[in-house]
Amino acid sequence: MPAGPVQAVPPPPPVPTEPKQPTEEEASSKEDSAPSKPVVGIIYPPPEVRNIVDKTASFVARNGPEFEARIRQNEINNPKFNFLNPNDPYHAYYRHKVSEFKEGKAQEPSAAIPKVMQQQQQTTQQQLPQKVQAQVIQETIVPKEPPPEFEFIADPPSISAFDLDVVKLTAQFVARNGRQFLTQLMQKEQRNYQFDFLRPQHSLFNYFTKLVEQYTKILIPPKGLFSKLKKEAENPREVLDQVCYRVEWAKFQERERKKEEEEKEKERVAYAQIDWHDFVVVETVDFQPNEQGNFPPPTTPEELGARILIQERYEKFGESEEVEMEVESDEEDDKQEKAEEPPSQLDQDTQVQDMDEGSDDEEEGQKVPPPPETPMPPPLPPTPDQVIVRKDYDPKASKPLPPAPAPDEYLVSPITGEKIPASKMQEHMRIGLLDPRWLEQRDRSIREKQSDDEVYAPGLDIESSLKQLAERRTDIFGVEETAIGKKIGEEEIQKPEEKVTWDGHSGSMARTQQAAQANITLQEQIEAIHKAKGLVPEDDTKEKIGPSKPNEIPQQPPPPSSATNIPSSAPPITSVPRPPTMPPPVRTTVVSAVPVMPRPPMASVVRLPPGSVIAPMPPIIHAPRINVVPMPPSAPPIMAPRPPPMIVPTAFVPAPPVAPVPAPAPMPPVHPPPPMEDEPTSKKLKTEDSLMPEEEFLRRNKGPVSIKVQVPNMQDKTEWKLNGQVLVFTLPLTDQVSVIKVKIHEATGMPAGKQKLQYEGIFIKDSNSLAYYNMANGAVIHLALKERGGRKK
């Protein structure tokens, strides 16, 4: 070919070839810059983000939009994948790359790296061998096992430098001299506070133990420690690999932690997004009363608990333990007894014996049933599939047989305590659990629960409970005090009374008297009043505290010359009123209960004509032809019937007792016996029936009255001012008793609900007025503490 055409042909090709050569070398830059020129509205991301976008676009182009949705769900919190959102500025570039990858115009993501990075990768790929590249690729493998812990690192506690040096020096000596040195040091310095860290309860003991272990490893190093240190000193690369592995492990742990937190956050967000009230009722199933369903029988709580235990053991041990842990019912026991053979019965007997004796060796023997004593039929020749070859079989070794129960062996029944044959123990246990006494105990416990739980009590029980409550709570229902005392007295009779003992010192006499009078009931108070009135004979020695002289003259029937002997324990009678001279006809009078002395028993005196002879009689006897004076209408209804009068001759004067006891109070002047109506009003025991009507009392008495309140002396109630003082109030007769309680509360601090007021033997109520109780000027009201349930101290 001529030179001309040859020279002329090359110039045109170089024009297209020169731009083609750089396009092959700079394919990525041209692809990135080429679409930017014709396409308007595409924002190109920076190089590090562009690489991720290109890779994602290539995967989405190959795998479809489902892969994009999966990436968007997995990387919802990763800001590097925000280009997947339609509102992101790089989303248009991402869609453009996806379309190019689908059309085959774009290359793989590796070509999308900038030019400078491509040149560096090409140079490094040319320099590094293939093995090194494989190692670089394998560095991203997730570490499986944690790195070994540091052996010579222990964070020092926050103590002073001197104490830290003491701990370290002690650890060095213990590591050098051994545990014997530590024991001697603990015994020698047990009182030295600086060595308290040697005690296991101390907070520095763990740190001291770590130091001892570290110093021991240094002083007495393990076998492979020197070779390991020598190897690491010769090859620093191995140390760097260990450091890198630790760093990767730390990063892996951090990633796992973040992943768990993200999963928890996703779960929380998912739960928060659920509208739990937005549901649709698909179908409603109504069970009719006459409908019969294939449902299991109802279970008791005991059976349910047994099933739960069986399930837990099944999950823990598997199917092998299910038969041993199974709880069998009575019907299953009967079926097994009929179906099983005598060897199985022996196995069950062995299990019962193991349950009673509870030894570990026999529990192990339960898993492998012992060979029965009864002869077994010879087994059939084994088939090849059933042959089991034991390699450790020794025919000469003696086989330890677990103890089997002898035919005449007896076991003690845990229910009745009787000796039962071992072969019949299981049947005895089954029958013993059906004892009717157990049913009675169960019914009794059910009744106790029903009585405790008043919700299930029938109407009659509720009525009786309210009636009993009303009889005891007078502060609520206002029942008479006598009825309360009766009810509470009936309860107190059943309780043993606590006896108060005096220690013999005069200083404790008053306190012992208060303790002795603490449990006095209303009936005892009535008896004391009767004794004070002389209606019944009394034994004063019962109320005295301390040693007393024995009775020199016991009570005995009177001799013929005397009618009655006065009890020796009564105080002496200084003077007996001589009755006036009476005419000869027989006339009998009964001396009424006149309080001659504080507590002397008064005998009724009967005069007889002179010369008459009286036959001997007992101290208390009904005399014939005696005109008994009837009781006045003002007598309280609570008083017991008076004893029959005693007949005394006219000229008879009772002799004083041999052993006189001094009276506790001065004797009032003696009054003549007949006028019973002339008793002072304050001496009578009043009731509400004997009071004057309120309107009549107001007509007779006008103006305010002065009332005295006797406060008890209660030193144990320090919050109230109860020192035995007397409070004086001036109130109109129309005021209620509650006004007095308010004033007492203001003066002493004692709440009105705790106050109990008594006026002349009557417990006054808050709702009544002063005129209702006929309170005159100078009336004395006694204050007491109201106990819960009406009990009085």
UniProtKB/Swiss-Prot annotation:
Ubiquitously expressed. Residues 1-43, 318-428, 488-518, 530-584, 665-688 are annotated as: Disordered. The record marks 169 as: Critical for binding to SF3A3. Residues 320-334, 354-364 have a biased composition (Acidic residues). It is found in: Nucleus; Nucleus speckle. SURP motif repeats lie at residues 52-94, 166-208. Keywords: Acetylation, Isopeptide bond, mRNA processing, mRNA splicing, Nucleus, Phosphoprotein, Repeat, Spliceosome, Ubl conjugation. The modification N6-acetyllysine is found at residue 55. Residues 509-518 have a biased composition (Polar residues). Residues 680-702 are annotated as: Required and sufficient for nuclear import. The modification Phosphotyrosine is found at residues 456, 759. Residues 21-34, 388-397, 488-502 have a biased composition (Basic and acidic residues). Residues 707-793 form the Ubiquitin-like domain. The keyword Kinase does not apply. It comes from the Eukaryota. Component of the 17S U2 SnRNP complex, a ribonucleoprotein complex that contains small nuclear RNA (snRNA) U2 and a number of specific proteins. Part of the SF3A subcomplex of the 17S U2 SnRNP complex which is composed of three subunits; SF3A3/SAP61, SF3A2/SAP62 and SF3A1/SAP114. SF3A associates with the splicing factor SF3B and a 12S RNA unit to form the mature 17S U2 small nuclear ribonucleoprotein complex (17S U2 snRNP). SF3A1 functions as a scaffold that interacts directly with both SF3A2 and SF3A3. Identified in the spliceosome 'E' complex, a precursor of the spliceosome 'A' complex. This is Splicing factor 3A subunit 1. It comes from Homo sapiens. The gene is SF3A1.
